[in-house]
Amino acid sequence: MNKKAAIIAGVAIVGLIGAFALSGKNKSQETEVKGTEVVTVQDENGTIEVAKNPERVVTFDYGVLDILDNLEVDVIGLPKKSVPQYLSKYKADTYSNVGSLKEPDFEAVNELNPDLIIKSGRQADMYDKFAEIATTVYLSVDGSDYLNDFSRNLDVLGKIFDKEDFVKENLDNLT
């Protein structure tokens, strides 16, 4: 075999090995998605698919934390520096600190291996960094239409955590 043919054969073999490696990875990712029920929700960035009932949740919004607390949904991480008094149980060591509302600690978030990250307007320009770590939902509340935005957030979280009936039954108490 001449030198040119050997180089072409070597490149082809490397390409085939890479293709096989990538095809195996895609199949395992597809299997994981197929085994998980997914819900489609509307956030500030549009329509997003989220695994239903994620277990490892990080939030960067205390309003969302309050909703999750009322829905009896556990979180694993939050910014702990300025947690409101009525949510002070989340200052416990049981919950990981993931930076501040304005300056997330992306390393700390990544180490938690979350299934879902919920962020708000203060982290609006950081969406891509969060999305590299886990599925990220962007929920916010506009002061000019607070009640409608809050109700929408309740609906989104109710759908994600399979608590839609609870939200409907308790909407007056939650708003």
Annotate each language-model stretch with its function.
Residues 35-37, 53-54, 93-98, 114-116:
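Short, flexible loop segments at the rims of nucleotide/cofactor-binding pockets, characterized by
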Residues 3-63, 165-175:
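Bacterial Sec-exported substrate-binding components of ABC uptake systems
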Residues 126, 134-175:
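Extracytoplasmic substrate-binding proteins
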Residues 40-45, 49, 98-110, 124:
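Early extracytoplasmic/lumenal segment of secretory-pathway proteins
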Residues 56, 61-108:
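A short, structured surface patch at a secondary-structure boundary
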Residues 113-119, 135:
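Proline-aspartate-enriched helix->loop->beta-strand connector
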